[in-house]
Structure formats: C-alpha cells, structure tokens
A protein has these predicted regions:
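Glycosyltransferase catalytic domains, chiefly GT-A lineage
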Residues: 1-144
Length: 144
C-alpha cells in the first residue's frame, strides 16, 4: 500500500501519531510512505524512519520543489495564509516514482481507526486519475 502525506517540522508530531494509527490498524500490510515536504530536521527524519521500520514499513522523504519548477514557479504559490506545500498533492503524479500506480493521500491531522485495505483496493475506472470520498463530519450530539 502506498500512502502519501505532506508535513514539515511543525506537523511531524501529528504525522507520527497518524502513521502509528495507520500501522496499528493495518498490521500485516506492507506500507510504503511518501512524505512530501519542504524540509524536516535530521532528527525528525530519523524518528519517522525508526517508526516506519519498527512496523516493517518504509518511508521516502521527497522535497519536490526542484521537480515542480518545470511545471510552475512554486515559490509564487506561497502566501501569508498558505504554505506552498498544500499544492504538492496536486503534483503527485510528477513527484512519485513511475512504478506507483495507486496511492492514498492521508492528512496528518487524522487518526486511522480501521483497516484501509478495502478502501485502497476499490476498483477504479482505468481512465480515472483521482478518486475521493465526501468529507465525513460527525453529527453526534456533544456530551458535556
């Protein structure tokens, strides 16, 4: 299973929690994680690598700015409100290795509560380039 996440040092802790929940709920599934980032510290990179290795999985750190320069001036996409990293997911076909035919993009500020194998293997139209689910919002009443 190929999983793509986007994070920088400010969200690495969130990424670690999400990845732990992913690995715990998908034991027995070999997971290859691609982290798209504009840079993380060596210490945080080691932490993520150790986490993935502890579960028998792998992580590839991708810093795609130079790859994307042939498609757009990525630095012009930066604003005071948004990091240019939010655009990385739009360019996944140009960032990921060619052998990656399918992947799940997961936000790092979530917790995976069930096995994702069924979702990952949903049959898609051969011409599909993207599939998405509707946003899911909990409508349960608040318990005070």
């Amino acid at each position: 299973m190929n999983v793509v996440i986007v994070a920088d040092d400010g969200y690495i802790q969130h990424a670690g929690v999400m990845l732990t929940s992913l690995f715990e709920t998908n034991k027995g599934c070999r997971i290859r994680v691609f982290l798209l980032t504009n840079g993380i510290s060596d210490d945080n990179q080691r932490r993520l690598e150790c986490l993935c290795k502890a579960y028998g999985n792998s992580i590839e750190i991708c810093q795609p700015d130079s790859q994307l320069s042939q498609y757009c001036d990525i630095d012009k996409l930066n604003s005071s409100n948004w990091s240019k990293m939010i655009y990385y997911k739009l360019f996944m076909p140009h960032i990921l290795p060619l052998e990656v035919e399918r992947c799940l993009f997961l936000d790092v500020d979530m917790v995976v509560v069930d096995n994702l194998n069924e979702l990952y293997n949903i049959p898609l139209n051969p011409n599909a380039i993207i599939a998405a689910v509707e946003d899911v919002i909990s409508c349960l009443p608040r318990k005070d």
